[in-house]
């Protein structure tokens, strides 16, 4: 018998961070019932007696606080699990919200999560051609090799730091602090700034890129260019025009797909990285690491850890 809601969640196979988050959501619901049950005057205030009416009142309360439907749906799912635990404990006879669902909630687009090993393999198997390559004597080979070296450095930051493609393009020389083992990621309209730790395995490769590869790439760019990742000229041109960086993602995506059929795109990589973070760190830490402006954005990734998040509900309350 699971004597506490926490042990009940653990028995369901939830990760440590999910258990902590879900337990706090349940406590928030209980606190609401204790403090604000006057909105339901016929309610005694005891959570064992809570019905769909009280749950709907709580969801209205969250809506007034500005929570999005997706976030409130996660909260609703937690209350469902809490009621199921109460049934197991003999504290209630049935689950009054078993088929309750918030209308208008769009299904979170879930990417198949790549394991840590699969993410590492994407990086490790991305090959940089050597001077013994059969095309090494072609006039385009030098820039081709440089682009591969640049791309491998980019993959390192996407797989370990979970950067978005626009964030990669915005990184400047001053943002990469190799001596301190840190990377500064500037904020934007959609994301917060943050400083992330570099892993020890990244330092030497990033140093090689910054002080060797980038210096060679600079020959094809403006000498005062401050971006960390530089473009190579398109075929037939002697210099980069400054827009080529915006065109690397489709080609790089196709390259990786050829070797890794499970790979879909770089949003999948970021989703996988954040999902793995949530198994290791708490919500607020992951919110900072991911650059999310609101914790509700981070909460959405909890869906990737919850296999039973209302996939099979056929009936719903017209909320």
Regions found by a protein language model. Name each.
Residues 1-319:
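Conserved catalytic core of the tyrosine transesterase superfamily
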């Amino acid at each position: 018998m699971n004597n506490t809601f926490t042990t009940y969640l653990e028995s369901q196979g939830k990760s440590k961070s999910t258990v902590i988050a879900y337990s706090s959501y349940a406590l928030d619901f209980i606190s609401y019932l204790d403090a604000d049950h006057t909105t339901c005057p016929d309610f005694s205030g005891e959570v064992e007696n809570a019905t769909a009416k009280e749950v709907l009142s709580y969801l209205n309360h969250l809506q007034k606080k500005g929570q999005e439907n997706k976030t409130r749906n996660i909260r609703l799912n937690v209350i469902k699990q809490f009621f199921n635990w109460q049934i197991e404990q003999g504290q209630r006879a049935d689950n009054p919200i078993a088929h309750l669902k918030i209308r208008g909630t769009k299904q979170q687009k879930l990417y198949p999560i790549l394991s840590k090993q699969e993410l590492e393999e994407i990086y490790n198997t991305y090959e940089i051609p050597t001077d013994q390559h059969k095309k090494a004597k072609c006039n385009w080979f030098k820039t081709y090799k440089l682009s591969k070296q640049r791309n491998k450095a980019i993959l390192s930051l996407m797989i370990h730091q979970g950067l978005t493609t626009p964030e990669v393009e915005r990184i400047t020389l001053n943002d990469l602090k190799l001596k301190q083992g840190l990377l500064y990621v500037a904020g934007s309209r959609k994301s917060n700034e943050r400083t992330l730790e570099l892993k020890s395995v990244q330092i030497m490769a990033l140093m090689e890129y910054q002080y060797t590869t980038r210096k060679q790439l600079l020959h094809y760019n403006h000498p005062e260019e401050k971006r960390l990742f530089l473009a190579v000229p398109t075929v037939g041109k002697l210099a980069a025009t400054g827009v080529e960086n915006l065109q690397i993602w489709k080609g790089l995506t196709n390259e990786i797909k050829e070797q890794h059929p499970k790979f879909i795109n770089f949003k999948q990589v970021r989703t996988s990285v954040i999902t793995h973070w949530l198994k290791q760190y708490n919500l607020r830490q992951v919110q900072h690491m991911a650059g999310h402006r609101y914790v509700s954005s981070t909460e959405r990734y909890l869906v990737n850890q919850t296999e039973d998040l209302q996939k099979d509900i056929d009936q719903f309350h017209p909320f």
